[in-house]
Amino acid sequence: LEISKDFDELVYIRAVSKAGREGVISQIPVRVWKQKPELAKIQCDQEPIGGWYSKIPVFSYDLKEKEGPQVHLYAQLTDLKTKEILTGIDQIPRIRKDGRYQLDIYTKDESGNRSEQLYQTTCFVDTDNPEIFVRYQNPRSEILKYQKAQIIVKDENLKKGNMILRTSGKQVKPWKLEGDHYETEVIFLKDGKQTLSVQAEDLAGNKMIIQEKSFIIDTQKPRIKIQGIDNGRSYSKPVKIQ
């Protein structure tokens, strides 16, 4: 007996001997289902920025019931750094921490038919803001003769073009990657009020802005002016000097 199409009926079978004697009729339920299930509709609670998420994304699915054998959802979450794999049947594994992940999802019915389509996405998760440090050469003071500042920006997912430096000083070194951070230097030479602010944004859209307290550069020597006497002149009476 060959069944070449979807079938869900009882098949009656009876054996007959060569002598013509008929056996008892047996009822055998036969279910054949060859249609492949549709892929479930996958949803995420947020929109990524170029594949990057600033919050841990949560995925859900909508699987509509249709005629035929029951359909199940199969999901696999792979940590691309550690190669750790989490799997789920009728549930999507949750991302628990920052990192880079690949999510694969398909559906399969109880007859073994698997969906032709595969949902696959890569998630880059970074929930931390960049860190910015400013280190001064001279102790901080409201008035200084000279100052130099080293600026350090740390973030695993930072691009050189995503840092903005605004200052009244002079940037003497371009941004340069040094190990796990970017750094630059600013010097303050001109007299007057000095300002410094730094902004950094990572690939996930996390931002950090610092505005340093202003200070004054004063390179001028004190000037002394004496009034009430003339140079080289003698006086017979007391004089008042200012």
Regions found by a protein language model. Name each.
Residues 1-242:
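Low-complexity, disordered linker/stalk regions enriched in Pro/Thr/Ser/Gly
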